[in-house]
Amino acid sequence: IEVPKGGAEGMLLTSGGRFAGYGFYLLAGKPVFLWNLIDLNRIRWAGPDALAPGRHSIEFDFEYDGLGVGTLLFNNMSGLGRPGTGTLKVDGKAVQTIPMPKTLPMILQWDESFDIGSDTLTGVNDADYRPPFALTAKLNKLTIKVDRPQLSPADIKRLQTAMQEKAKAD
């Protein structure tokens, strides 16, 4: 992003809103990533300082500690809702890392939107901003990379065995 003189604020990217989802935004010039867990809990990563005028790279990286959706192929939900660790980075340097003891086992934002540069429906955190919360910085590039966990051959064998044992028991 490119922050103008006088600072910037606003939504970079959001998916979801008041009842579930996430937002990546600048608040009083500081980068914030917030994960709204079905309005029961909000986990918030924030940079300690407002971004100075000029070009910056801001990134949110989440490392999931589970097997992921691949377990569903074996009628097993054990890969979903597992913990993970989120890290907020500014110009390549980690500014805050927070572990999440649980994640949502599904996506719950059917009535919300995916927005870039503003938030067009409800906000993920009313305590921080009110929509549309238009971005006042210049967004030069946005990259979204999703690395889904991959089942190992040992994971597959274990899940197949569990599915077969369950079928015998039923």
What is the predicted role of each segment?
Residues 1-170:
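Extracellular glycan-associated modules
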